Amino acid sequence: MNIFRLTGDLSHLAAIIILLLKIWKSRSCAGISGKSQLLFALVFTTRYLDLFTSFISLYNTSMKLIYIACSYATVYLIYMKFKATYDGNHDTFRVEFLIVPVGGLSFLVNHDFSPLEILWTFSIYLESVAILPQLFMISKTGEAETITTHYLFFLGLYRALYLVNWIWRYYFEGFFDLIAVVAGVVQTVLYCDFFYLYVTKVLKGKKLSLPA
């Protein structure tokens, strides 16, 4: 495992922990898109079904279990534990416009036409756009809490580091996964505007807002 993969995983884990702590400590999920979190839970569920069929390493298995457990814990906090604080009026992105095309694409473009491979491909495509409901929600409300922006920053950093990881693996291992790379580029591009606002506003102590 190279340093970019490791730091990418740690950034991803940091984002998840920041979000869970934000919700738990504030006893509120205000400003958090439940729809994005449901999509991420679906991403991890469909991606890590190989937990039942293969073992790569203790690290790999542990991270998969952590991602799945944390994603469902987040969904539970939003839709059950702190349901009264969930801002459903602004979390209105039509997720079917993401799931249906992604589902169709995963059947058409994949590495192998087998159930696990199609589901893995579906998860890769879906993850690339799963943050859209959250960004859409921020654009509707006009701003985001600082802690929420930190969550988004580490989530975007994770994907950017994974892009570097794939470049590293291509040059030093000869490994190249076109599906993962293209989806990763799409996901990183979606964060570009946010990264700019994060650096120019949040790091200077200002509130973040996205153009409506």
Swiss-Prot record:
- Keyword Ribonucleoprotein applies: no
Disulphides: none
* Entry GO CC: cis-Golgi network; COPI-coated vesicle membrane; endoplasmic reticulum; endoplasmic reticulum membrane; Golgi membrane; membrane
**Could you say what the effect of mutating residue 158 to F is?**
Loss of binding to the sequence motif K-D-E-L
**Chief localisation class:** endoplasmic reticulum
The protein's UniProt keywords, in alphabetical order, are:
Cytoplasmic vesicle, Endoplasmic reticulum, ER-Golgi transport, Golgi apparatus, Membrane, Protein transport, Receptor, Transmembrane, Transmembrane helix, Transport
| Cell compartments where the protein resides | Endoplasmic reticulum membrane; Golgi apparatus membrane; Cytoplasmic vesicle, COPI-coated vesicle membrane
Q: Name one GO biological process term.
A: protein transport
Q: Which residue intervals are topologically Lumenal?
A: 1-4, 53-58, 111-116, 169-178
> How the protein is affected by changing residue 127 to A/Q?
Loss of binding to the sequence motif K-D-E-L
- Topology: which residues are Cytoplasmic? 25-32, 80-92, 136-149, 200-212
GO molecular function ontology, one term from the record: KDEL sequence binding
Positions in coiled-coil regions: none
Name the residues annotated as site: Important for recycling of cargo proteins with the sequence motif K-D-E-L from the Golgi to the endoplasmic reticulum.
Answer: 193
Q: According to the lineage, what is the superkingdom? A: Eukaryota
Record membrane topology: Multi-pass membrane protein
Name the segments for region: Interaction with the K-D-E-L motif on target proteins. Answer: 47-48, 159-169
**Entry's family note:** Belongs to the ERD2 family.
- Give the protein's function: Membrane receptor that binds the K-D-E-L sequence motif in the C-terminal part of endoplasmic reticulum resident proteins and maintains their localization in that compartment by participating to their vesicle-mediated recycling back from the Golgi. Binding is pH dependent, and is optimal at pH 5-5.4.
- What name has this protein been given in UniProt? ER lumen protein-retaining receptor 2
Species of provenance = Gallus gallus
